[in-house]
């Protein structure tokens, strides 16, 4: 699915307009298509996530934004400027307005925390006093003011990523690109980095374009998300809407890996595509809003008049809105299934039949 041109606004921070990227193959083989006719707008001031499996085209997409790659066809606009039309001087100016953080921190081991953050300012020719005035507040912002004289080897992974974030902000960019920036971090550190990105977005009004393969990251911090698969945008929208009304199988597969939503291995192994006599149907329920605060399972049991087993589940918030996912099993016979389906419809639940178990 691509973004209709009528939905592309001149006020967007980044616009991909019918972008394709093909890499030549060796030995006369067919060229590899990394991106296929991608159209997408990134709203100014948003935290937008691009999520997909490894090899889906995420990193290629983000490299087009700062001109590290050029599209084979289509155009990429940053603040209304056609990136592909820029000369070398124009690209240098663009890259000063676009910060980037990576999975691997790319710090210089011979430089202190202060020295690493100051590096892009030194390259830009800024004088020492101005560098000091710029770097000190950034170290305060990322919580490393007391570590300014330390070296990377003395710091944790999370602290190293904070240096990377401060360095990316040193040139006062309007846009921050994050390429799997939390993938090498433990869950607790990941949450602290995501909270920092959220605070930077709010306090500096910075647009953040975040590349990840983790739905937990998308859920925690983004306002909008696009799902990419085999070089195509297959689903996009506000994060809450994509989570609660996912339409594409790739999105559903990524959502199934969220904590509390994943099937126990024994159940997953026993799933069948069709029901036999006496089997139970396994259904994933997605509920939100007022439904997330009601005793739905007890009401479901009363409605169907039969046993309902809870296999997995989670209740959380996305963008301050309550959201829940439950995997349940109940009789696959026509009477029980019919009553359950009516209950789901009447209560506005989104359902997905996962299969059948004995």
Curated annotation (Swiss-Prot):
It is an enzyme of class 7 (translocase). Its EC number is 7.4.2.11. GO terms for cellular component: plasma membrane. Part of the ABC transporter complex MetNIQ involved in methionine import. Responsible for energy coupling to the transport system. The complex is composed of two ATP-binding proteins (MetN), two transmembrane proteins (MetI) and a solute-binding protein (MetQ). Belongs to the ABC transporter superfamily. Methionine importer (TC 3.A.1.24) family. This is Methionine import ATP-binding protein MetN. The gene is metN.
């Amino acid at each position: 699915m691509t973004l209709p041109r009528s939905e592309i606004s001149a006020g967007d921070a980044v616009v991909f307009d019918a972008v394709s990227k093909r890499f030549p193959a060796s030995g006369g083989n067919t060229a590899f298509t990394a991106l296929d006719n991608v159209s997408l707008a990134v709203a100014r001031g948003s935290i937008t996530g691009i999520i997909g499996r490894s090899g889906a085209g995420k990193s290629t997409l983000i490299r087009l934004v700062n001109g590290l790659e050029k599209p084979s066809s289509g155009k990429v606009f940053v603040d209304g400027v056609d990136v592909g039309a820029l000369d070398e001087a124009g690209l240098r100016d663009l890259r000063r307005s676009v910060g980037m953080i990576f999975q691997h921190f790319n710090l210089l081991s011979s430089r202190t925390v202060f020295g690493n953050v100051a590096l892009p300012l030194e390259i830009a020719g800024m004088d020492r006093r101005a560098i000091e005035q710029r770097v000190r507040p950034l170290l305060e912002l990322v919580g490393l003011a007391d570590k300014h004289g330390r070296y990377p080897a003395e710091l944790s992974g999370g602290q190293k990523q904070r240096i990377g974030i401060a360095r990316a902000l040193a040139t006062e960019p309007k846009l921050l690109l994050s390429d799997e920036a939390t993938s090498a971090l433990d869950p607790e550190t990941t949450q602290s980095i995501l909270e920092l990105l959220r605070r930077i977005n709010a306090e500096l009004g910075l647009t953040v374009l975040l590349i990840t393969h983790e739905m937990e990251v998308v859920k925690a911090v983004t306002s909008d998300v696009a799902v990419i698969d085999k070089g195509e945008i297959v689903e996009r929208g506000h994060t809450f809407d994509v989570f609660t009304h996912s339409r594409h199988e790739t999105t559903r597969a990524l959502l199934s890996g969220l904590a509390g939503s994943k099937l126990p291995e024994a159940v997953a192994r026993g799933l069948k595509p069709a029901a036999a006599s006496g089997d139970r149907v396994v259904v994933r329920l997605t509920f939100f809003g007022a439904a997330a605060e009601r005793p739905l399972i007890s009401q479901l049991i009363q409605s169907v008049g039969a046993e309902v087993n809870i296999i997995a589940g989670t209740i959380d918030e996305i963008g301050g809105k309550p959201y829940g996912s439950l995997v349940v099993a109940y009789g696959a016979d026509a009477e029980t299934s019919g009553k359950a389906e009516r209950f789901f419809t009447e209560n506005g639940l989104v359902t997905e039949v996962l299969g059948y178990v004995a």
